[in-house]
Curated annotation (Swiss-Prot):
<dbReference type="Pfam" id="PF13041">
    <property type="entry name" value="PPR_2"/>
</dbReference>
<feature type="repeat" description="PPR 4">
    <location>
        <begin position="282"/>
        <end position="316"/>
    </location>
</feature>
<feature type="repeat" description="PPR 3">
    <location>
        <begin position="236"/>
        <end position="271"/>
    </location>
</feature>
<dbReference type="InterPro" id="IPR011990">
    <property type="entry name" value="TPR-like_helical_dom_sf"/>
</dbReference>
<protein>
    <recommendedName>
        <fullName>Pentatricopeptide repeat-containing protein At1g77405</fullName>
    </recommendedName>
</protein>
<feature type="repeat" description="PPR 6">
    <location>
        <begin position="353"/>
        <end position="387"/>
    </location>
</feature>
<dbReference type="InterPro" id="IPR002885">
    <property type="entry name" value="Pentatricopeptide_rpt"/>
</dbReference>
<feature type="repeat" description="PPR 7">
    <location>
        <begin position="388"/>
        <end position="419"/>
    </location>
</feature>
<dbReference type="Pfam" id="PF01535">
    <property type="entry name" value="PPR"/>
</dbReference>
<feature type="repeat" description="PPR 2">
    <location>
        <begin position="199"/>
        <end position="233"/>
    </location>
</feature>
<feature type="repeat" description="PPR 1">
    <location>
        <begin position="164"/>
        <end position="198"/>
    </location>
</feature>
<keyword id="KW-0677">Repeat</keyword>
<feature type="repeat" description="PPR 5">
    <location>
        <begin position="317"/>
        <end position="351"/>
    </location>
</feature>
<dbReference type="InterPro" id="IPR051240">
    <property type="entry name" value="Mito_RNA-Proc/Resp"/>
</dbReference>
<comment type="similarity">
    <text>Belongs to the PPR family. P subfamily.</text>
</comment>
């Protein structure tokens, strides 16, 4: 019989509490556990809960994922991080604020739990639970334990069904996200040891991890290997999209003009090679290249790609139009940006969102066109969107400086304040600890009298 969801939650809480209290996983704990029978979902829930209590510090609760960081991801060096912690130097990146002692306890308890349910309850681990345990060891930076665990599990009778290509691919993705790209590459080359054969998804995963740290030479080597005549797993559209997107993003992150020119040239060359080999670019491929061209002031090439995608029947979406709107807003070609937004709505290619209106409003305010900025804010709110706190304050200040403060309806003010306050409350539930002022700042100011509201600027 499958345990109910409230019962599963109680069991997870009970086991996590036992881990925090450092209680041994023995027959005494087994007798007090009411999970009969154990299910794969319940075991996965326990393993997924361990990082939240042992790997994450209060200061990093609610932090953005690595792919949202502006700075390029770098290959992590555990010995260097350990030296920095001993010297009380701030460690940045995925390993920030991790307490090695807590992580070690969490890994120890996770392994005890993994083998405890086998011994006392006769639970047969499958591919999913072994994959979750391997990813847990990777997130805890225990690579020796990870290799030993995979070797031990793969040598079992059902080892071929437990350690599969899909599970190794998921592990490589986890290692890449944590900044351990060399370890992910080592896992890729160890697949044969675990009786697995890499497929196109495994190649795409390791190429993506290599591109994230800027190792394009190795990524191109793997792509060339996939392009060999008769290779079992040739590249697909996603393989080329990974490289095109990475060339554009990594070039802009370096901040070097020469590097930007080189990377954009490589991205366009990869796009032409993709067409030459008979692959059809999708909207994601076009969006990556168009966004890179817009952000590097290559608007002619971006418009050429835009027309090309429409000619080939690839329908642009909101992301495509937002790239042009941001470019036109930054260069003060506001009429072009507004025309792009109206075209998107007219052709039904997307619905304007906050990321569409915000650059337009900021550009109008900077060019002292507060009345038009106010009209866009009204249109935005009537569409069910809430402007950012900074955008709201910017428009209010611009209207006041031009003597148009009374033209914005009080009911509209109220709706925006309520939306801002609701969003602020949601953020506070996700990230209750705001120790770093560059992450979240709170401002209190008055608008139209005695009403205060908290403004969060990210």
């Amino acid at each position: 019989m499958k345990p109910s969801q409230p019962l599963c939650n109680r069991i997870v809480d009970q086991l996590i509490t036992a881990m925090i209290q450092n209680r041994p996983f023995d027959a005494v704990l087994a007798s007090s556990t009411v999970a009969k029978p154990w299910t794969q979902q319940l075991v996965s829930d326990v393993l997924h809960s361990i990082p939240r209590f042992f790997f994450i510090s209060p200061r990093s609760i609610g932090r953005q994922k690595g792919f949202r960081h502006r700075s390029p991801l770098k290959q992590r060096n555990l010995s260097d991080e350990s030296q920095r912690r001993r010297s009380e130097v701030l460690v940045l990146g995925p390993g920030a604020y991790m307490d090695p002692k807590k992580v070690s306890i969490g890994l120890q308890k996770a392994l005890e739990f993994f083998f405890w349910i086998e011994t006392h309850f006769g639970f047969d681990h499958n591919e999913i639970t072994c994959r979750d345990m391997a990813c847990l060891l990777a997130k805890g930076n225990d690579f020796k334990g990870l290799w030993d665990f995979l070797r031990q599990v793969s040598r079992r009778e059902n080892g071929k069904n437990v350690v599969t290509t899909a599970s190794i691919t998921c592990l490589m993705k986890c290692l890449g996200e944590e900044g351990f790209v060399k370890e992910a590459l080592a896992t890729f080359y160890r697949m044969k040891e675990y009786h697995c054969k890499p497929d196109v998804y495994a190649y795409n995963t390791i190429i993506n991890a290599l591109c994230r740290v800027g190792n394009f030479k190795k990524a191109r080597f793997l792509l060339d290997q996939m392009q060999l005549p008769g290779f079992r797993y040739p590249p697909d559209t996603y393989t080329y999209t990974i490289l095109i997107s990475s060339y554009c993003r990594y070039g802009m992150q370096t901040g070097c003009r020469k590097a930007i020119r080189r990377r954009m040239w490589e991205a366009n060359r990869m796009f032409r090679e993709m067409l030459f080999r008979g692959f059809v670019p999708d909207v994601v491929t076009y969006n990556c290249l168009i966004d890179g061209c817009c952000k590097t002031n290559r608007i002619g090439r971006a418009l050429e790609l835009f027309e090309d995608m429409k000619t080939k029947g690839c329908v642009p979406n909101q992301v495509t139009y937002n790239s042009f709107i941001r470019y036109y807003s930054v260069t003060n070609e506001i009429e072009g940006a507004i025309e792009m937004m109206r075209t998107m709505k007219k052709l039904g290619h997307g619905v304007p969102g906050s990321s569409t209106y915000t650059p337009l409003i900021h550009a109008l305010v900077e060019t002292r066109r507060a009345a038009e900025a106010r009209d866009l804010v009204v249109e935005m709110v009537e569409a069910g969107l809430v402007p950012r706190e900074y955008t709201y304050k910017l428009v209010c200040d611009a209207l006041s400086s031009e003597g148009l403060a009374s033209t914005l309806d009080e009911e509209l003010h109220k709706r925006m304040r309520e939306g801002i306050q609701q969003r602020y409350s949601r953020v506070m539930k996700i990230k209750p600890t705001m120790a770093r002022k560059e992450v979240v700042r709170k401002y209190f100011h008055k608008i139209d009298g005695n009403q205060n509201f908290a403004m969060e600027e990210i």
